[in-house]
Amino acid sequence: MVRSAKPAGGHDPGPTDADEGIWRGRKVARRLVSPDGMVVLVGRNAEDNDILTAKLASPRDFWLHVASGPGSHVVVRNPGGLRRLPRETQRFAAGLAAGYSSAKDGGRTAVHLALAGDVGKPRGFAPGKVQLARFETVMATPQRAPEAGS
């Protein structure tokens, strides 16, 4: 299930531009809220993926991407510095990474999960291409957000 509203009864200290997926006045990511109440940002294209990962993501945020092909970068904001994603948020974010990728029409697929601080972009890499220092692989069923809420 994909939700895009704030969790009921959850404390919201107020969004920052980064929490809204906005860079220099331009929306570069879809903003969703996971079942556990965490902000999830989904890149819209290769150039926006670069901005999302390199400019908006904090090193302690979680980063996800389908393992085998092109797709959106997904960033889960982590202001509390959690060491692991809550299970439902991981399932939600990994599903979005698979759903906004070349694997969107397939079944369960592998998704890389890393801390954003372990994601780098070497000089000369094409837009959207990155290199991972450390990551784990999780399996996910593709899902997409309702377009009206993007």
Summary of predicted features, one role per range:
Residues 2-150:
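Duplex nucleic acid-engaging cores and interfaces of nucleic-acid transaction enzymes
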